[in-house]
Amino acid sequence: AADLLVVCDYGQILSNEALATTPLGGINLHGSLLPKYRGAAPVHWAIYNGDLETGVTVIHMTPRLDGGPILERVTVTIESTETMPQLEARLSNLGRSCVLSAMLQLEDWDGTSLIGELQDASQVSKAPRLTKEQGQIQWEQSAEQIKNQVRAFQPWPGSYTWLLQEAQEPLRLVLGDTRVG
């Protein structure tokens, strides 16, 4: 039988019963500096919001969404032209060593004492799932915000606008790259 559940990019909350099936419970690799950006799309929202840094966090799992004690955390700078897939790949590479380090912390754990660092509830922010509608560019936003949206919403939902032409159906235009300046 397994001693530990390891979860990465899993869109569900595991119950206490599921976590109790292994002596050490479970750990979760999350693509943000928890407690910031709890939820399904942390990398997208970090770029969209113009954050200068993000990272990965490994938590000991509890039934609260991304709310368990922090075992490992690594911070990285978000490059100004980096897209979501590029940043996600970098974070994924960092995550491997963080998961291994967290597993070593649990190796001698007694299963009852608190392990890790409790998250600061006053610092919690959400990273909800994206919707297709969020990809529509709002032209009243700044050029920098539109650039961040295009970078953040790749590959889905993408960033798009509508071209209205006289006596024709509206044409949906998808933006794939932007440069401010």
PLM-predicted stretches and their roles:
Residues A121-G181:
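Internal anion-binding site segments
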Residues L4-K126:
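Donor/substrate-binding cores of folate-linked one-carbon enzymes
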